[in-house]
A protein has these predicted regions:
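Short acidic loop-to-helix transition motifs that present clustered carboxylates
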Residues: 210-211, 231-233, 254
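Adenosine-phosphate binding glycine-rich loop
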Residues: 267, 272-336
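Glycine- and other small-residue-rich loops at beta-strand/loop junctions that grip anionic moieties
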Residues: 64, 68, 247-251, 271, ...
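Loop/helix-junction capping segments adjacent to catalytic residues or to phosphate/diphosphate-binding pockets
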Residues: 73, 190, 253-256, 280, ...
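Segments forming oxygen-rich coordination pockets for charged ligands
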Residues: 2-226, 240-243, 278, 284-285, ...
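ADP-ribose/adenylate-binding Rossmann-like module
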Residues: 206, 244-245, 249-255, 260-285
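Short amphipathic alpha-helix with an adjacent loop that forms part of the alpha/beta core around
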Residues: 230-241
Length: 336
């Protein structure tokens, strides 16, 4: 087996945002007019957050999600009737927006930006820049002027709200899809991968043992399984600022090398499984042998995860993903 992912449905492994942009680009390149919808704000309960996207054509074909399905159906029905002829417009669902007013089952309210794109060079170039941002390493901002209809893109820093509005300008931030690198297979690792996929992460499992990967491929069809040492994959550019790295094997030969490479990257989360005693020994070993600094070691969560009294592999995986979610959302551990 080589060091490429095991063969599987590549589309299933792609984050939904990337699927939306790729589908829109495909339709534009084939000469079809498209509509791109983006959730701008949500009030009360809402199944999808700001930045969620859906792309559609008048025939009803679509890709993406704005809600649990009710908004999508209503939008597609109205699109077929030609109700979204404007270059762009903001539509409110759930609170007296479109007539007849549509109440959402969850009781929430969503503001959705609806943009019409013609199959022309400027539209194709715009979608290509969005695709590049989603598969790349850097965040990109796209600004839409509601009055003039102009659309511009540019680089954006590592932090900031996904959607913002200033006067007639709406700014939407896109960037690398959240990624989880699982360093070595174990039962806990398999549960972590499963939960991460449910949270919308791109999951990459690196393990040098082909027999383990073959077994896991049936359990995790939407993860990328690569026969390679995790440290090698990371050293070759496997991490970006939206990446979390978890070492869950209890094998110091695998885990230590992974941690040594991970602290040299922009990964937002690095963690290793083990008891408090094991973790102290590991940190001492990394300091002595690998020359990690205090700052390097402070980036490593060990023991990994939140203290939830977890015992079973699934419970441990929940604590790991909960801690990753905490860090990603900027919540201090002391605030829990």
């Amino acid at each position: 087996m080589d060091q490429s992912p095991l063969k599987r449905n590549e589309k299933c492994m792609e984050h939904l945002d990337l699927q939306v942009i790729k589908q829109g680009l495909q339709w534009l390149e084939s000469g079809r007019q498209i509509w791109l919808c983006t959730v701008l704000t949500t009030f009360e309960s809402a199944p999808r957050g700001p930045g969620s996207m859906l792309v559609a054509v008048p025939s009803g074909e679509n890709c993406g999600s704005l809600s649990g399905g009710c908004i999508e159906d209503d939008f597609l029905d109205r699109l077929k009737l030609g109700q979204f002829a404007a270059h762009n417009q903001i539509v409110r669902y759930g609170d007296g927006g479109l007539q007849p007013t549509m109440a959402l089952p969850c009781g929430g309210v969503l503001d959705v930006l609806v943009e019409r794109f013609e199959p022309e060079r400027s539209s194709i170039d715009h979608f290509r820049s969005l695709e590049t941002a989603l598969v790349g390493r850097d965040r990109l901002s796209r600004t839409i002027n509601l009055k003039s209809g102009s659309r511009t893109t540019g680089p954006h820093g590592p932090t900031g709200r996904s959607v913002s509005r200033s006067g007639e300008d709406v700014t939407i931030i896109l960037g690398p899809v959240r990624r989880l690198i699982v360093a070595g297979l174990s039962t806990v690792a398999e549960f972590c991968a499963e939960f991460a996929l449910a949270l919308g992460y791109e999951v990459i499992i690196c393990d040098p043992h082909p027999e383990r990967l073959i077994k896991a491929s049936a359990l995790l069809p939407n993860a990328k399984l690569i026969e390679v040492l995790p440290a090698v994959f990371i050293a070759q550019g496997g991490c970006h600022a939206a990446t979390a790295v978890v070492a869950l094997t209890h094998d110091p030969r695998l885990d230590d090398l992974t941690l040594m490479e991970s602290v040299r990257t922009d990964a937002f989360y690095i963690g290793a499984m083990g008891s408090s005693k094991t973790s102290l020994k590991r940190m001492d070993r990394l300091e002595r042998i690998a020359g990690l600094t205090t700052q390097d070691m402070q980036r490593i969560s060990a023991p990994i995860g939140l203290h939830l009294g977890s015992k079973t592999p699934a419970e441990i995986a929940i604590s790991v993903m909960a801690d990753i979610l905490r860090v990603r959302n900027g919540i201090d551990r002391a605030a829990l």
